[in-house]
């Protein structure tokens, strides 16, 4: 996917001050309910969940359900499983078309974290803000829908329905469903000591989109202008937008090639939160230790300048449509990282070895002084495409 021209509201006969991100008070997957609260809310659902003999069932047909990002439900016939996920987010960028693509990629990401590369069907969930004027609604929402549809087509699937409602905030999401044979998905519970942790997108998207909005807010911009330039912010924002819109499908396919043992995608709970959740699911007594944090260029400095506001260095900063965190055999990890960069998969794919799996008690942690890997923007080398339907 090529880089796009910056969204210009006036090209769509909108006021130049129009910002999609103003139609929600939370950003992206920053809408997540805190993990501890979520677990308590789900307790009543889990009480009577899967009363069958789990050991027998697991040996015959793997199953995942409440508390996980994706459900894997054995079907009654044919040795197949239903694999399904749902997700929604709030606007995190101001380009409606790209926001649609990001929303779709975010929904699909939970399938990809299971190593599933084919999606049979998608539904779109759309909340149209009642604060949008008729003109804004009629110009902006079709762009969002088109972006969602285009991303679904890139993923080899289609949108066949959904639900659209009025809402105070713009809400974007969907449901992704597929039917799989057991060899088409990878259960996220087989990490072993000696594995390494690989991450397939840099961190810092939430920081990049936040500071991009600060360009219009002098009192906030003044806090960080000594550590970052306007050009740095613009590049980080564009890079974040392209990363969020990029599907994790290539990484999902390579999980099979290089014998991945477990994976999750990095979204609203941050790198550490999702690593902890994945560690809890492991069959073996292991723990994850993260040594390296790949971060969008200059965003680590911005985060430090803001104190603990973002939580980036502590692993708690939310990501939207982030990369996959994959447990790979040590001897396979470097080959995975090299292969994902191959031009045959298109531009923009990267991966980093960020930590290890060791014997432990199913926890995850970041070392006291992790190495920050500054990830330079790649967009300068890519073509720029205009927004669909814009008038010159």
UniProtKB/Swiss-Prot annotation:
| ATP-binding in keyword set | yes
Which Pfam families does the record cross-reference, listed alphabetically? AIRS, AIRS_C
- What CDD domains does this protein's entry cite? SelD (cd02195)
Kindly list the residues the record flags as site (Important for catalytic activity).
Answer: 32
What GO molecular function annotations does the UniProt record carry, in alphabetical order?
ATP binding; metal ion binding; protein heterodimerization activity; protein homodimerization activity; selenide, water dikinase activity
> Active site located where?
31
Task: Report the top EC class in one word.
Answer: transferase
Q: Where on the tree of life does the source sit, at the highest rank?
A: Eukaryota
Q: Which Gene Ontology cellular component terms are annotated?
A: cytoplasm; nuclear membrane; plasma membrane
What does the UniProt cofactor note say? Binds 1 Mg(2+) ion per monomer.
Q: Which UniProt keywords are given for this protein, alphabetically ordered?
A: ATP-binding, Cell membrane, Kinase, Magnesium, Membrane, Metal-binding, Nucleotide-binding, Nucleus, Selenium, Transferase
The UniProt annotation places Mg(2+) binding at 69, 110, 265
Cofactor names: Mg(2+)
Ligand binding (ATP): 32, 67-69, 87, 110, 161-164
**Keyword Kinase, does the record have it?**
yes
According to UniProt, the reaction catalysed is: hydrogenselenide + ATP + H2O = selenophosphate + AMP + phosphate + 2 H(+)
Q: Main subcellular localization, coarse class?
A: membrane
Its localization reads: Cell membrane; Nucleus membrane
Q: What are the GO BP annotations of this UniProt entry?
A: selenocysteine biosynthetic process
Please state the Enzyme Commission number of this protein.
Answer: 2.7.9.3
Q: What does this protein do?
A: Synthesizes selenophosphate from selenide and ATP.
Summarize subunit and interaction data from the UniProt record for this chain: Homodimer.
What family does the database annotate? Answer: Belongs to the selenophosphate synthase 1 family. Class II subfamily.
Query: What is the designated name of this protein?
Result: Selenide, water dikinase 1
Native species: Xenopus laevis
Q: Gene of origin?
A: sephs1
């Amino acid at each position: 996917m090529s880089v796009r021209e910056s969204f210009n509201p006036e090209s769509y006969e909108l006021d130049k001050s129009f910002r999609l991100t103003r139609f929600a008070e939370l950003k992206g997957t920053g809408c997540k309910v805190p993990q501890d609260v979520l677990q308590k809310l789900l307790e009543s659902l889990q009480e009577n969940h899967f009363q069958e003999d789990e050991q027998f069932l697991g040996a015959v047909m793997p199953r995942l359900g409440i508390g996980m990002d994706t459900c894997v439900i054995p079907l009654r016939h044919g040795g197949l499983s239903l694999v399904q996920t749902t997700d929604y987010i709030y606007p995190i960028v101001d380009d409606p078309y790209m926001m649609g693509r990001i929303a779709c990629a975010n929904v699909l990401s939970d399938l990809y974290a299971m190593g599933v590369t084919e999606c049979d069907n998608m539904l779109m969930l759309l909340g149209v803000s009642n604060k949008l004027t008729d003109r804004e609604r009629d110009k902006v929402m079709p762009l969002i829908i088109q972006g969602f549809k285009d991303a679904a087509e890139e993923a080899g699937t289609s949108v066949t329905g959904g639900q659209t409602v009025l809402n105070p905030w713009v809400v974007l999401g969907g449901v992704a469903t597929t039917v799989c044979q057991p060899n088409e998905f990878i259960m996220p519970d087989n990490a072993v000591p000696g594995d390494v942790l690989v991450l397939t997108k840099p961190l810092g998207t939430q920081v990049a989109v936040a500071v991009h909005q600060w360009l219009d807010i002098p009192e906030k911009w003044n806090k960080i202008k000594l550590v970052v330039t306007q050009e740095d912010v613009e590049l980080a924002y564009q890079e974040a937008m392209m990363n969020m819109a990029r599907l994790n499908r290539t990484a999902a396919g390579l999980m099979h090639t290089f014998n991945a043992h477990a994976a999750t995608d990095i979204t609203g709970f941050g790198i550490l939160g999702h690593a902890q959740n994945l560690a809890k699911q492991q069959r073996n007594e292991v723990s994850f230790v993260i040594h390296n944090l790949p971060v969008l260029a200059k965003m680590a400095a911005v985060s430090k300048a803001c104190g603990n506001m973002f939580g980036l260095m502590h692993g708690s900063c939310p990501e939207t449509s982030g990369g996959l965190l994959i447990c790979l055999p040590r001897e396979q990890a470097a080959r995975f990282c090299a292969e994902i960069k191959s031009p045959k998969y298109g531009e923009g794919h990267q991966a980093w070895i960020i930590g290890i799996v060791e014997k432990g008690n199913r926890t995850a942690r970041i070392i006291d002084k992790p190495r920050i890997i500054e990830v330079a923007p790649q967009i300068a080398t890519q073509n720029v495409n205009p927004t669909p339907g814009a008038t010159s």
